[in-house]
Design a protein with these regions (language model features):
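Short, surface-exposed acidic
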Residues: 123-134, 215
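P-loop NTPase catalytic core of nucleic-acid-dependent motor ATPases
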Residues: 4-21, 35, 84-109, 113, ...
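Short, surface-exposed, polar/charged, turn-prone segments marking secondary-structure boundaries
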Residues: 117-118, 124-126, 198-199, 268, ...
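Conserved AAA+/SF3 P-loop NTPase catalytic/coupling segment centered on the Walker-B
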Residues: 288-298
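Extended, Lys/Arg-enriched charged tracts that mediate electrostatic binding to polyanionic substrates
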Residues: 61-74, 129-169
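Noncatalytic partner-interaction/assembly domains of nucleic-acid and motor enzyme complexes
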Residues: 54-57, 61-113, 117-127
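Short, hydrophobic/amphipathic alpha-helical patches that form generic packing surfaces
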Residues: 75-79, 143-144, 226-227
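Replication-associated primase and helicase/ATPase modules
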Residues: 1-84, 197, 201-206, 210
Length: 298
């Protein structure tokens, strides 16, 4: 084989190797609204072995130390997440992963499990990757690396955003438009149905006219449910539904629970919410609405 043929053959081999590498590292976009478990397993499967010593590139030729390995691992992990459209951020001290529609909360134990498995896939010693201190270091480093200061202009924003399956409804003084989902909206929920401005439910209005015939009261009910979807409007109000038994309160509750999604509603009584040591108030965190079926005896 002459020199020209050898060069051509080598070029073909290199080209094929590059193609194989690109195919192996091609980002895979998960279905939107994937569960945290699905996101975790997918990100673990995307992790590949890396040479920590080469990346650290210590001038004395020493191996990468613990600090360097921790920083490198999280940097590489964030690259994997970004390449697979799974942006990671810190919102009010908690880790969230964007799934293409909204930001899903990743609990501490889930995050530490994920980071330990990713570290093992990146060439950590198997025992070291399972050690709680290793996972604690990675978890704390992710908090530091993924943190971005909140935009102070957000607190002055008067635009209302409501997240639906088919887009985000943007409401302001000029009107309302349905647009694409955007990670910068920082929405942490998605209502499980499409927005349809022409949708009607005659059966519901028939029920409402029977159980709550006063039109002004109907408007107040609708206004309050809409208020719960606003982020910046601080009315600091709660709504009481008064009445004897079998007057439709439980039907309203079931409708609201389905409307907002069970994962976005909690059910603390007024007594539980107002206790001096209200430890249960932690359940209000990341919820759109608290709907207490009973006031309580306090």
């Amino acid at each position: 084989m002459d020199t020209k043929q050898q060069s051509t053959s080598m070029l073909e081999m290199v080209t094929q190797s590059i193609n194989n590498f690109e195919q192996a590292t091609q980002p895979t976009i998960l279905p939107t609204s994937s569960s945290p478990e699905e996101v975790i397993e997918h990100l673990i499967s995307c992790a590949r072995p890396i040479d920590f010593d080469a990346i650290a590139n210590n001038p004395d030729g020493k191996k990468a130390n613990v600090i360097q390995k921790t920083v490198i691992t999280i940097d590489e992990f964030k690259k994997i997440a970004d390449q697979n459209n799974r942006n990671i951020t810190i919102i009010k001290g908690e880790i969230f992963i964007y799934n293409g529609v909204y930001w899903q909360n990743l609990e501490e134990n889930e995050a530490k499990y994920l980071l330990g498995k990713v570290a093992e896939a990146m060439n950590y010693d198997s025992i070291d990757s399972q050690f709680y201190r290793t996972r604690d270091r990675l978890y704390n480093q992710l908090h530091s690396a993924a943190y971005t200061p909140e935009d102070s202009s957000e607190t002055k924003c008067e635009t209302v955003l409501v997240n639906f399956r088919n887009g985000t409804l943007e409401v302001n003084e000029t009107g309302a438009i349905l647009r694409e989902h955007r990670p910068e909206d920082k929405l942490t929920y998605c209502l499980k149905y499409d927005y349809d401005p022409n949708a009607k439910c005659d059966k519901f209005y028939t029920f409402l006219n029977q159980m709550l015939p006063d039109i002004e009261s109907q408007v107040i009910l609708f206004e309050y449910l809409g208020y719960t979807l606003t982020k910046y409007l601080k009315l600091e109000k709660f709504l009481l539904l008064l009445g004897e038994g079998k007057n439709g309160k439980s039907v309203i509750y079931e409708i609201v629970r389905k409307l907002f999604g069970e994962e976005n509603v909690c059910n603390l009584s007024l007594e539980e919410v107002t206790k001096d040591k209200g430890y249960c108030r932690i359940d209000l965190h990341n919820k759109l609405l608290n709907y207490g079926s009973e006031i309580g005896g306090r």
